Amino acid sequence: MAYSVVRLRKVSALGISRVLQADKGSLWRFHFEPEFGDLLRLGVLTRNYRKNSGSPKFDFTGTGTTSKFDFTDLTCPHTWYPIARKKKRKVILHVGPTNSGKTYSALKHLEQSSSGVYCGPLRLLAWEVAKRLNKANVPCDLITGQEKDLVEGATHKAVTVEMADVTSVYDCAIIDEIQMVGCKQRGFAFTRALLGIAADELHLCGDPAVVPLVEDILKVTGDDVEVHTYERLSPLVPLKVPVSSVSSIKTGDCLVTFSRKDIYAYKKTIERAGKHLCSVVYGSLPPETRTAQATRFNDETNDFDVLVASDAIGMGLNLNISRIIFSTLQKYDGSETRDLTVSEIKQIAGRAGRFQSKFPIGEVTCLHKEDLPLLHSSLKSPSPILERAGLFPTFDLLSGYSQAHPTHGLYQILEHFVENAKLSSNYFISNVEDMMKVAAIVDELPLGLQEKYLFVVSPVDVNDEISGQGLAQFAQNFSKAGIVRLREILAPDRVKVPKTPTELKELESIHKVLDLYVWLSLRLEDSFPDREVAASQKSICNLLIEQFLEGNRLNSPARFSRYLRRQKLSE
């Protein structure tokens, strides 16, 4: 069984109660993606929210005679980024469906610029762009929440959007998948990049549904806005008949389902038929493993010619898919089971048929006939216009509010902002439920606001018991000793090749905890000194996960023998 040993203080199943004292010797088993860069810059900066309003003195305690400052007034977020406001930016929207060449066009501008930054929603995309630019002799740094790969003489950066630097000046910048400003959890990071990146040219790539909102938001910034519309480069054909059985699966197919359990069930069923091997892609797989699985699926020299995946294929991976097959058009979104939205269906379906690939014409259908009407109507419909973008108070505002209310913990501060934030009609407060769960834990520890905030915005899945326990242990050890050694948390000799999907999930969880340690080590280097060890352990986890995905596949001795022969030929 793959697991690591954790010496933990217990937390509640939901991860929101206080950290409790553990019994001596009790052992707990150990389980991201948002990363945050400049959001963690400190210093209370009093902003001038209205033009020509002067520079009033603020009473942070509420006991003086000077004017009080309303820290919950978020009506003018464009004023939070003075460097960008000094520029009259040329903002170019590249909008169109999947496989329309919109991002390719923007990247051409980035390659030709004297300095620039690419901001993507996923590490996978940042990796891909950094690799592309460096190959084109454009020196490019790679910066994500968990890694910093600096290239000598770099003039460009490829970053995850949360790591976007709003204090630097660029010739050219790209924000990819800009429609994610409307994401309930991560939208604020895209809004921050949209308002805060100081670039002469800012290229925004995404769905046409975002255009009216972006144009409205940028009316107050003085930027010039252009809209370039793209059409799909290769046909996408909605089929009129379903795939009645997985026995009809063929080479190049991608079967889409929305639970980890179903992914492995379909994989097992397809492989038992003896015709195909399946690669798998889903969100909780490490990014490195997702890339490896996509590469294996695309490689025509091996037998992994079918993909079983979640909506994680919607962005970040280049895939040679002939046909998308929806096993269902419903998904559980964390609170309820609902129909897929028009945007979700179009994003996933659009992955079929890739320009200049083995399958230039894409097809899309369902397993069940009753799902076809929704599929067809969604593909014909435009995505609903986005009406609001996510927003979240800067640390400056939270820190100022904390000084005005010194008895309030971070949980109370976040709660107050959610309940009392003043917003313009273009914005909504991002969902801070997960942040508040972490805040409830760290508020019980002797930590400063800066340190609490760091843990609150860290890439932890608080809805996973093991992940929540890992964060609690890190915070507890940090508050007690100021240093967190990895050997006190993980027992690497207990990590073994998983034999079942359940054991695989535990190994994926270990990888996430190691990922969290690396993230913290890049921000608290002296307190989390074992970054190299954690990175090494992550690599081992990736290897073991790959071994499981390769080994847990064949029930046919003949097919297994053929796979072994291919492996020997490739050595």
Curated annotation (Swiss-Prot):
Q: Which of the seven top EC classes does this enzyme belong to?
A: hydrolase
Q: What's one GO MF term for it?
A: ATP binding
SMART domains (alphabetical):
HELICc (SM00490)
Family matches, as InterPro entries: DEXQc_SUV3, Helicase_C-like, P-loop_NTPase, RNA-DNA_Helicase, SUV3_C, Suv3_C_1, Suv3_DEXQc
**Is the keyword Nucleotide-binding in the record?**
yes
Q: Which UniProt keywords apply?
A: ATP-binding, Helicase, Hydrolase, Mitochondrion, Mitochondrion nucleoid, Nucleotide-binding, Nucleus, RNA-binding, Transit peptide
Activity regulation field = Activated by the presence of mitochondrial RNA.
- Gene Ontology cellular component annotations, sorted alphabetically: mitochondrial nucleoid; mitochondrion; nucleus
Provide the residue positions that the database annotates as binding ATP. Answer: 96-103
Task: Give the phenotype of cells or organisms lacking this gene.
Answer: Variant nuclear number and positions. Pollen development defective.
Chief localization: nucleus
EC number(s) per entry: 3.6.4.13
Where does the Helicase ATP-binding domain lie? 83-212
Motif, DEIH box: chain positions? 176-179
The annotated subunit structure for this chain is: Homodimer; in free form. Component of the mitochondrial degradosome (mtEXO) complex which is a heteropentamer containing 2 copies of SUPV3L1 and 3 copies of PNPT1.
Its job: Major helicase player in mitochondrial RNA metabolism. Component of the mitochondrial degradosome (mtEXO) complex, that degrades 3' overhang double-stranded RNA with a 3'-to-5' directionality in an ATP-dependent manner. ATPase and ATP-dependent multisubstrate helicase, able to unwind double-stranded (ds) DNA and RNA, and RNA/DNA heteroduplexes in the 5'-to-3' direction. Plays a role in the RNA surveillance system in mitochondria; regulates the stability of mature mRNAs, the removal of aberrantly formed mRNAs and the rapid degradation of non coding processing intermediates.
Q: What is this protein called?
A: DExH-box ATP-dependent RNA helicase DExH16, mitochondrial
Q: Which organism is it from?
A: Arabidopsis thaliana (Mouse-ear cress)
